[in-house]
């Protein structure tokens, strides 16, 4: 598969058009760092319609803007990279319309550094859902005709086990507590990526991480 075929298949012109007209319903599939299993490469894509140029920089290319330049289609800059692993760090080096160079993290990143570190991170994993029983139960239950009592919480301050918050570890205890207290639903404060723990998630820096 040559480069033009890669572009047509993994940065489809129709999807770019839908995004630019505000009609894309699955923009996260078009943008960001996505692993393309068929070609064993990661595709990077970022929307920067007014940029003069964009390049991918990361720990895999020495953070050198000259090594991985990106190409443009309809305001979206993209490139394909082989051999990356989960945890590789990256950013976009953008030359703006006025010639200023800025380094930006990926707004569609699936994984990000935290605290004072601001690089995006490559993610090649996947999650296998095993909630078939619950989904069937939910489909059969008329939530509009059932009592509802919602428990809102911030996971990091509800209980923090040694080593930090662990969703899998905290789930059984949280479910038991809410059941005993008579709650029917749990509402979690923001879980998207944010830089400052004290904000309880209200300073979002990445909706997909």
What are these regions (language model features)?
Residues 1-43, 71-152, 157-162:
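The feature marks proteins involved in alpha-glucan
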Residues 47-54, 63, 85:
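Short proline/glycine-enriched turn/loop motifs at strand-loop junctions of beta-rich domains
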Residues 54-56, 90:
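Short beta-strand elements bearing conserved aromatic residues within extracellular beta-rich modules
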Residues 138-140, 171-182:
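Short amphipathic alpha-helices and their capping/turn segments at secondary-structure boundaries
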Residues 163-173:
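Ligand-site clamp/hinge motif
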Residues 165, 176-209:
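Aromatic-lined carbohydrate-binding/catalytic grooves of carbohydrate-active enzymes
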């Amino acid at each position: 598969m040559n480069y033009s075929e890669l572009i047509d298949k993994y940065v489809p012109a129709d999807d770019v058009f839908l995004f630019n007209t505000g009609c894309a319903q699955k923009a996260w599939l078009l943008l960001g760092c996505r692993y393309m299993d068929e070609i064993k490469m990661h595709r990077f894509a970022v929307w920067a319609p007014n940029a003069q140029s964009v390049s991918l920089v990361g720990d895999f290319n020495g953070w050198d803007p000259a090594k991985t330049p990106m190409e443009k289609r309809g305001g979206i800059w993209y490139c394909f990279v082989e051999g990356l692993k989960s945890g590789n760090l990256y950013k976009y080096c953008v030359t703006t319309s006025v010639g200023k160079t800025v380094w930006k993290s990926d707004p569609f990143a699936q994984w990000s550094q935290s605290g004072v570190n601001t690089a995006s991170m490559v993610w090649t994993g996947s999650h296998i859902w095993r909630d078939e029983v619950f989904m069937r139960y939910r489909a059969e239950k008329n939530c509009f005709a059932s009592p509802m009592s919602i428990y809102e919480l911030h996971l990091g301050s509800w209980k923090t086990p040694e080593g930090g918050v662990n969703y899998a570890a905290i789930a059984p205890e949280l479910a038991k507590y809410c059941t005993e207290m008579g709650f029917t639903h749990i509402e979690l404060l923001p879980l998207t990526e944010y830089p400052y723990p004290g904000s309880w998630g209200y300073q979002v820096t990445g909706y997909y991480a």
